[in-house]
Amino acid sequence: MSQTVHFQGNPVTVANVIPQAGSKAQAFTLVAKDLSDVSLSQYAGKRKVLNIFPSIDTGVCAASVRKFNQLATEVENTVVLCVSADLPFAQSRFCGAEGLSNVITLSTLRNNEFLKNYGVEIVDGPLKGLAARAVIVLDENDNVIFSQLVDEITHEPDYDAALNVLKA
């Protein structure tokens, strides 16, 4: 199965399907800014916001990290995981320069399966191999309680919808 999103108005194909509310999140291991492996299970008992995007070096992606850094202070027992294919060095540099300390950046550097398993792998077009823009919210038991695959990659996600699920 696949889905279609758009990049600058042009259709691009995304492999698989984003997890839907009510489904169980798949386990994953990604790379932290210190190059250590970080697993989903390390956040057991906390709610998770997965802010998934192509690259921190684009304006819209950077804006989403800044916004989720701010929103992270508004919800309890919640971690915000910002996931991209960027090298951990770039993620760390960006967050350090911006003074962002309420989000955790994770890289798909050693795990391209994450993109496939979470239905965000762009498989054609100029962004082939990167992640489509998506937000997935998990409860304390890793059940999906909200997901959004953003139709136009150059647009920001629906922050209010994700926040409302966490405040419900």
From Swiss-Prot:
Domain Thioredoxin: 19-168
Keywords noted in UniProt: Antioxidant, Disulfide bond, Oxidoreductase, Peroxidase, Redox-active center
InterPro entries in UniProt: Redoxin, Thioredoxin-like_sf, Thioredoxin_domain, TPX, Tpx_CS, Tpx_Peroxidase_subfamily
Catalytic residues, chain numbering: C61
Domain of life of the source: Bacteria
Enzyme Commission identifier(s): 1.11.1.24
Gene Ontology molecular function terms on file: thioredoxin peroxidase activity
Reaction catalysed by this enzyme: a hydroperoxide + [thioredoxin]-dithiol = an alcohol + [thioredoxin]-disulfide + H2O
Disulphide-bridged cysteine pairs: C61-C95
PROSITE patterns in the cross-refs: THIOREDOXIN_2, TPX
Pfam family, one: Redoxin
HAMAP family associated with the record: Tpx (MF_00269)
Function statement: Thiol-specific peroxidase that catalyzes the reduction of hydrogen peroxide and organic hydroperoxides to water and alcohols, respectively. Plays a role in cell protection against oxidative stress by detoxifying peroxides.
Misc. comment: The active site is a conserved redox-active cysteine residue, the peroxidatic cysteine (C(P)), which makes the nucleophilic attack on the peroxide substrate. The peroxide oxidizes the C(P)-SH to cysteine sulfenic acid (C(P)-SOH), which then reacts with another cysteine residue, the resolving cysteine (C(R)), to form a disulfide bridge. The disulfide is subsequently reduced by an appropriate electron donor to complete the catalytic cycle. In this atypical 2-Cys peroxiredoxin, C(R) is present in the same subunit to form an intramolecular disulfide.
Family classification: Belongs to the peroxiredoxin family. Tpx subfamily.
Oligomeric form and interacting partners: Homodimer.
Protein name in the entry: Thiol peroxidase
Species per Swiss-Prot/TrEMBL record: Salmonella typhimurium (strain LT2 / SGSC1412 / ATCC 700720)
Lineage of origin: Bacteria, Pseudomonadati, Pseudomonadota, Gammaproteobacteria, Enterobacterales
